[in-house]
């Protein structure tokens, strides 16, 4: 039975121009739950406030937790939270295809948001392969070790248990498997984290690896911070420092163990993310030679590509490599479909995802973000597909060129919004990401985190009133938590993601007709399909979270 839509006009305020005068929403027929819903002319928008979680400590512990979302002045968010239906979503652990208790991240979050189902992540798949002995039976890995016999095997990647880009246990498993396969020389080039983990947790991870590597005879020969080795914004001067350390043995020569050397760097004021290149063996000489095998054990692609290109591309022009060893280059997962290098774990193919369905229906969609999150609203949101769907437009706004985003917490949010406002009326679906809460949250600088949150709130105050004037609808959510916990219990900065829940707020002229159920990130795509008046495919196992009242 059809239900007729009634209109609720909230007293929504634009912080720049004052109260918004909105025309009434035309009455439309709306068929609830499992049936078609006729959408109005305005766009449907998914607004992802990246890294904006809900700290269970609330206002009482906002200073103790360094909760930038509650320390900030957010009058527009407060109004949305008060006047529109909302609920909470789980964005971590098994609810997003990660191991139980594992914090979420942007790649995982956007995969689940776009797929409309729980997407079992590479971390989970690789852990399972190691536990069940499948890793050592992998054909690509066996061929890799065969190539490494008589040469050096170089294991490069992020050494931490952050689980966002890698897990150090995977490196240990690869080293053990290589030893069992007859590989004699195993060099580990370790990237320290400090972003998805504690800023000074790296020494402990290295200490564990030093012990675990004794079985395989592997040795840590390089340590360098991810700031240099995992840049993704074409800051090639950073990548060159990592290349020079790994390939040419250039850096600070250390006589102590890697863990002890890193501890000393802490005393000198350095932290893991910004760890300068440290060299422990074969200093100031070419260490990667023709015929060697280089295995990049990060499972997430975006921050592994620049260094990979330096190894792979003949016409590479990011920096002067000085030498280009002809190596057998292998990656744990597929980093890019254009790369010729083999990979150990093939990507999981996802069908009937949100972008595909919207495109097949002949609707126009816009994906927009600044550089830091552009891959997430495109490649990851589309299930690992690089090519846009038909009628899917993409707009990239360059992120500011600063060393760390606490120096410019506004990032490029205002430029993003200018672009959205100019294009909004031309699309049926808009996927928008605000990078600030996550990227500034990673710095651990609370004052900057507060400014980042306030920046996003000001942007929301510009975009939502315009959307409502167009009779559009918005879902406001996040991909994971971060900036709601920027201080640890001991008072030290917290730079990692959290496992906290995230907001789910429905903003529309008809919002009073609905309540929002709690759910998981996989429920967002089915809800958007409902708002677009499109049927939900069987492969989308999430649920529409809007329930009529």
Region spans (language model):
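Cationic, low-complexity basic patches in intrinsically disordered or flexible, solvent-exposed regions
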Residues: 3, 12
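Feature captures the catalytic ectodomains and active-site-proximal regions of enzymes
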Residues: 7, 18, 25-549
């Amino acid at each position: 039975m059809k239900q007729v839509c009634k209109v609720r006009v909230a007293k929504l305020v634009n912080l720049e121009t004052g109260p918004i005068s909105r025309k009434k929403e035309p009455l439309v027929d709306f068929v609830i739950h499992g049936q078609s819903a006729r959408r109005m002319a305005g766009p449907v928008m998914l607004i992802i406030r990246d890294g904006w979680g809900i700290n269970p400590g609330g206002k009482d512990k906002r200073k103790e937790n360094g909760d930038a979302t509650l320390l900030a002045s957010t009058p527009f968010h407060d109004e949305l939270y008060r006047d529109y239906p909302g609920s909470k979503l789980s964005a971590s652990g098994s609810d997003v295809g990660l191991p139980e208790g594992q914090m979420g991240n942007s790649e995982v979050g956007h995969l689940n948001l776009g797929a409309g189902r729980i997407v079992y992540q590479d971390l989970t798949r690789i852990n399972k392969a190691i536990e069940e002995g499948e890793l050592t039976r992998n054909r690509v890995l066996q061929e890799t070790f065969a190539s490494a016999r008589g040469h050096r095997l170089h294991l490069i990647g992020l050494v931490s248990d952050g689980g966002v880009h890698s897990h150090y246990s995977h490196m240990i498993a690869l080293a053990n498997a290589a030893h069992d396969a007859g590989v004699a020389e195993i060099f580990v080039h370790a990237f320290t984290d400090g972003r998805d983990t504690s800023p000074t947790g790296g020494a402990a991870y290295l200490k564990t690896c030093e012990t675990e590597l004794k079985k395989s005879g592997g040795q840590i020969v390089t340590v360098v911070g991810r700031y240099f080795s995992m840049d993704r914004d074409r800051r090639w001067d950073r990548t060159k420092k990592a290349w020079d350390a790994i390939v040419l043995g250039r850096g600070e020569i250390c006589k102590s163990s890697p863990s002890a050397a890193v501890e000393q760097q802490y005393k000198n004021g350095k932290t893991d993310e910004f760890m300068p290149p440290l060299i422990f063996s074969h200093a100031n000489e070419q260490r990667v030679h023709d015929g060697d095998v280089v295995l990049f054990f990060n499972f997430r692609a975006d921050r592994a590509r620049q260094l990979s290109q330096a190894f792979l591309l003949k016409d590479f022009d990011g920096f002067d490599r000085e030498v280009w060893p002809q190596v057998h280059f292998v990656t744990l997962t597929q980093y890019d479909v254009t790369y010729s290098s083999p990979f150990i774990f093939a990507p999981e193919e996802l069908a009937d995802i949100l972008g595909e369905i919207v495109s097949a229906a002949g609707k126009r969609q816009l994906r927009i973000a600044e550089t830091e999150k552009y891959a997430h609203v495109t490649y990851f949101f589309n299930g690992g597909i690089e090519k846009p769907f038909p009628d899917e437009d993409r707009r990239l706004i360059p992120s500011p060129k600063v060393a760390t985003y606490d120096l410019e917490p506004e990032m490029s949010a205002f430029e993003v919004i200018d672009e959205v406002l100019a294009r909004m009326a031309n699309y049926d679906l808009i996927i928008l990401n605000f990078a600030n809460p996550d990227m500034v949250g990673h710095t651990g600088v609370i004052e900057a985190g507060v400014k980042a949150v306030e920046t996003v709130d000001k942007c929301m105050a510009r975009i939502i009133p315009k959307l409502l004037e167009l009779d559009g609808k918005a879902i406001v959510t996040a991909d994971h938590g971060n900036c709601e916990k920027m201080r640890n219990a001991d008072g030290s900065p917290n730079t990692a993601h959290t496992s906290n829940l995230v907001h789910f707020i429905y903003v529309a002229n008809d919002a009073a007709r609905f309540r929002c159920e709690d759910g998981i990130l996989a429920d967002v795509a089915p809800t958007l399909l409902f708002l677009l008046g499109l049927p939900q495919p069987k492969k989308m196992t999430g649920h529409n979270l809007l329930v009529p009242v």
